Regions:
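Short acidic-aromatic low-complexity motifs
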Residues: 2-35
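Hydrophobic pocket/interface hotspot
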Residues: 13, 26, 34, 53, ...
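Short, flexible active-site loop motifs that bind/organize anionic cofactors or intermediates
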Residues: 16, 47, 119
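A general alpha-helical scaffold signature found inside nucleotide-binding enzyme cores
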Residues: 8, 52-56, 105
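A solvent-exposed, acidic/Ser-Thr-rich amphipathic alpha-helical stretch
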Residues: 31-77, 82
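A beta-strand edge to alpha-helix "cap/lid" segment located at domain peripheries
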Residues: 2-5, 62-135
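Residue-level recognition of oxygen-bearing side chains
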Residues: 22, 56, 125-128
């Protein structure tokens, strides 16, 4: 893929997430053999940790929509190469079950091959996320 193709794929992912597209529509951007990694307190929230397969993204979309109210989600920049896009931004979310809010900067690293996302890695303030979830 070219740098522009990778950038467009990252933008399409963000667009689908922001438009409340169905989880299966979002998942079509991802490989069946997706590697999913959000470092942090595994068990605090169902999407934290290492997972494999396209179900990781559908589960994330479904679970996060059910459990979290998005307050803000701001993309500050998208950096792209032929096989990787890095989305830099900040977010604030409220956990529905306890009303706690987390505010954090983030980096989402999307690795792409053959026109689809093969690896999703999110870096955020995992300590703050854990405190919100366990709080």
């Amino acid at each position: 893929m070219s740098q522009n193709d990778t950038l467009r794929l990252a933008q399409e992912f963000l667009g689908r997430m922001g438009s409340d597209a169905e989880p299966t529509e979002i998942a079509k951007l991802f490989s069946e053999t997706l590697e999913w990694d959000i470092a942090g307190d595994t068990g605090a929230l169902p999407w934290i940790g290492h997972k494999s397969g396209r179900a990781a993204i559908t589960d994330f979309v479904r679970d996060s929509r059910a459990m979290i109210d998005r307050i803000t989600f701001e993309v500050h920049d998208i950096l792209a190469s032929d096989n990787r896009a890095v989305i830099l931004g900040s977010l604030a979310s409220k956990l529905k079950r306890n009303g706690k809010v987390v505010t954090t900067d983030f980096a989402i690293v999307l690795t792409v091959a053959n026109g689809e996302i093969v690896r999703f890695q999110m870096l955020e303030d995992s300590f703050a996320v854990s405190q919100m979830a366990r709080g």
